Amino acid sequence: DGHHARITDARRLTHLHEVHRANEGDRLTVGIQGGAMGKATLTELNKTQALFALEDINEPPPPALPVHLVLALPRPRMLARTLEHVTALGVKDITLLHTKRVEKSYWQSPELRPEKIHQHLILGLEQARDTQLPNVTLCKGFRPFMEEQLPALLTERRGLVAHPGMENACPRGIDEPTLLLVGPEGGFIPWEVEQLLAAGCEGMHLGPRILRVETAVTALLSRLF
């Protein structure tokens, strides 16, 4: 009704009981999905529900990063963790892309069902105390992406391709709209890198270490922004 809220799902109830160790009468920070944040008083808490009396819910969520992340589809378990991490860091636009070294079987994973993706995004938002869900797009072909999506994505963004062996190091502290492209575990193949550079992207590297995708993405976002 705009003044009260109810939680009934087991995961969040367990979090209130075991992590917050909340008690009736506690004031907690809350957020409305897609909306603002603020404070609420916990008026009832039991095994089946939590009731809140909402106060002024008018605080904006944390600012988003000015980045559209294009990520070669990782293996399913890593996809789940990566979605949570990048959502917590403030990424609001994500494209999952097929490349030569992405196993085709990954596209059949239950982790790509809309409800599973939504679940991982929610976990990332909760971790960061954010309310704005990212947009996730699936692109199952590299050539169609290059021809139909990349030109528009680059019109108002600086394109950066993260790939070992590139000449330039990853820039630091940039504050401009950016398109960040990250390859799969084995990296982009040379032809893919050539196509991306020819389209106007800049190549860059994170140093001599070869990192797992989830580690590399976190490091890139932290360094860039």
Regions found by a protein language model. Name each.
Residues 3, 24-26, 36-38, 48-50, ...:
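A generic structural signal for short beta-strands and their flanking turns/coil linkers
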Residues 16, 79-82, 192:
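Hydrophobic side chains in well-ordered alpha-helices
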Residues 60-158:
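RNA substrate-binding interface of SAM-dependent RNA methyltransferases
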